[in-house]
Amino acid sequence: MSAILSADDLNDFISPGVACIKPIETLPTQPGPEQSQQPQSLEFEVILDGQQPTTGSSSNGTTPPAQISLTDCLACSGCVTSAEAVLVSLQSHNEVLTLLDAAPALRVIQDSDGKPVVSGLENPEAKLFVASVSPQTRASLAAACGGAVTEQQAGWMIEQLLMGPAGLAGGGKHGNGFTWVVDTNTAREACLMLGSDEVLGGGSWGGSDKPTSPILTSSCPGWVCYAEKTHPYVLPHLSRVKSPQALMGTLLKTTLSRVLGIAPDRVWHLAVMPCFDKKLEASREELTDTAWGSGGVPGRGVRDVDCVITSKEILMLAASKGVDFFGLAKSAPVKQPMFPDSDIHRFLFPAQRRKQLRDGGTSGGNLHYIIQDVLSKHAGSQIQMTRGRNADVVEFAVLSSSGETIFKAARYYGFRNIQNLVRKLKPAKASRMPGGKPFGSARRPAGKSATLEHSYVEVMACPGGCTNGGGQIKVDDQVVIDRKNFGEKPGPDEQKAWQAEVDEAYFSGDESDPAQGAGDDQSMELIAGISPSYIRDTLAHWADITGIQLDKLVYTSYREVVSDVGKPISDTERVVQLAGKIGGGW
């Protein structure tokens, strides 16, 4: 028997969307002076909430607040997309401030030969601070600013906060700020090309474990968490390409550590994302230096992304330092310092920003890019789009000039629609009778499922996509109510209008800018504004300067998460668990 943890059971719980199956454990109290004189047993009793002690122990009626660590989340199969409820205390704006005040930051300077070197390494607590920011975060903050503030201008305001004198660098114990603030769009463009090659068998695909068709997007951590914990049969379908957050983290950690000759843990990477579940993604063992450590330099479990904060937490970060975020200048604070490698610098800080294409949606455009890649390979082909039961389910077909179907794909956003998707992918149960038909075959004949005919499905947990992520600023947040002068609590109509503002900000690139991406040249062949050849050359250069195989840098893996809750454990395992909790979880 194990108690089920829910909001009703705890007065300090943070209201998750689903019940967590971790049992509420109460650690044994420290023995008093009289008890300490008595022989001690090696047995300990874990008292579940609502249960009475089986021994003669007494309770004073007060129990410490229940705590659930990130380790608990990764070890059980209870929660799906409510990771924010248990991760706020582990990755937050307070952690950013704590690290910034821990020691003077490492500095990258030029030696007498003009080569980049790091100063300040004599202090073991010193870090080199670098941040990456998602376009959805910039869109959310731009909408909160109002006054036709663009996504790019909101990005400059974030740079002012993270690295400018009017922000974090203007105060604190050591006056530390972030050395670089990069745009995850550059990593996203690499992910788009890698994902298309994975689906269509293009030149960059080098993975040994190609996913099973239909290939499903894996850049949404809420969706991946749900699949690993509740529907492991879909794991062979998940794309092996890292998410933009993960790829950017690997790029920054590997390049800076290998080129500058410092340990990966001396580089501290902050990601600013629209989703609380990105905190969970950053904590995956597969996304640490254990996955890419090579060449006699084994990994030690150092995260590629050390901390994730959301769009909301950017405002909290500014407020905690007494900075009015909305009063920051809407221009770049300073020119970004030169990255230690010139080719990587050109990739991270392109001369021109590529405008977001509306046809690509608000979640990065994975499906749109793949379809454009298919169209580029078949002259005269065209797209046929069919809307599903709601706006978050759309099916696409690429038809040849003769009307023959060349490629089929779909988009599934929102948890309810995802449930329908995984239900269609569920394999039929084998019959226990010799020669009998598999269970479910009468209801779902083989080959009749439209979803199984798709080559690719773009899956996102949030309805409407990533601009509607759980970490985004919402219309009923006090900052929006104040800035919008709402007389009463916003309703569904205001929520819809607010989401439209965020989406509009996401697509608010300069109309005069060409649809070009990092390093694109007019002479290069472009797909959805991206040059695949330039991306491939950049990735090859990255692997070369770090001495790490490209497969280890750009691909990841997934595994079924099996719950141990309710299963018998040995005394040794129980003591180890208790010791871990007494020591603080992490």
From Swiss-Prot:
Record-listed [4Fe-4S] cluster 2 binding positions: 220, 275, 462, 466
Organism domain of life: Eukaryota
GO MF assignments: 4 iron, 4 sulfur cluster binding; iron-sulfur cluster binding; metal ion binding
GO BP annotation list: iron-sulfur cluster assembly
Signal sequence extent: none
Binding residue positions for [4Fe-4S] cluster 1: 20, 73, 76, 79
Matches recorded under Pfam families: Fe_hyd_lg_C
Keyword terms, alphabetized: 4Fe-4S, Iron, Iron-sulfur, Metal-binding
Recorded family membership: Belongs to the NARF family.
PANTHER family in the cross-refs: NITRATE, FORMATE, IRON DEHYDROGENASE
Record function comment: Component of the cytosolic Fe/S protein assembly machinery. Required for maturation of extramitochondrial Fe/S proteins. May play a role in the transfer of pre-assembled Fe/S clusters to target apoproteins.
Name of this protein: Cytosolic Fe-S cluster assembly factor NAR1
Native organism taxonomy: Eukaryota, Fungi, Dikarya, Ascomycota, Pezizomycotina
